[in-house]
Amino acid sequence: TKALDELIPNWKNEGAPVKTKVSKEKFLFLGKNSSLSWPTWLLPSVQKNHKNYIISLANLCRWLAEQAEKLGVEIFPGFPASEVLYNDDGSVKGVATLDMGLDKDGNKKDTYQEGMELHAKVTVFSEGCRGHLGKQLIKQFNLDEGKNPQQYGIGLKEIWEVSEEQHQKGLVMHTAGWPLDSKTYGGSFIYHAENRQIYLGYVIGLDYQNPYLSPFDEFQRFKTHPSIRKMFEGGKRISFGARALIEGGIQSLPKMYMPGALLIGCDAGTLN
């Protein structure tokens, strides 16, 4: 919580949704019907979660938005940035939001609302993986010159509600191995959060060689493993989703600044 401590020192008193401390960690290497527990002290530091918290990022972002609005920050949910605006000297001037209230042919409806121009001394782009404006900026300013090609993965996630007996609040668990073969990058995360909820996810690199591989089907197969299935039997899946992930690492990281703008987060490639 170092960054949160610096940003909002009294975040605990302000009701931040950061409550479930990591209490136990596991790393399993799975065979088809077996599992090998890997000693956590052998794991790299990025895989160690001592003193970390299990959170819902969506809940934290909503709370941070409330704190920002208290300081006078204006937030425009539902208004996507559609275009980068430039000054005469080529520097970034800001963005324009999308026109709203158009029919499928682009004609104006009664609810038409023209997009807004938002100008700033520095515009920060944080659109996530392969952001459509971020891609334009990387090309426009040649930010990836001399860098390795970027690599991508897909992450599938579910939230489950399980019984008290199956729930181990504070447990962080990762797995590698089955159902993927040795040539395919991927693995899982299983986080036991509050309210008897488990955040379950599976990530597969999109450079897999088998054209018949289905990331979704591999995720479902993973849940049938004896070491995994027992956590969810009798439980209920309450939400699910998927997203693209940046996997290229530091050797693929573009320059993150340009005249009048910054790239941050997965728009630049700084996963974790």
Where are these regions (language model features)?
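Domain-scale detector for complete catalytic domains at protein termini or as standalone homologs
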Residues: 13, 104-109, 236, 244-245
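FAD-binding beta-loop-beta segment adjacent to the flavin cofactor pocket
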Residues: 242-271
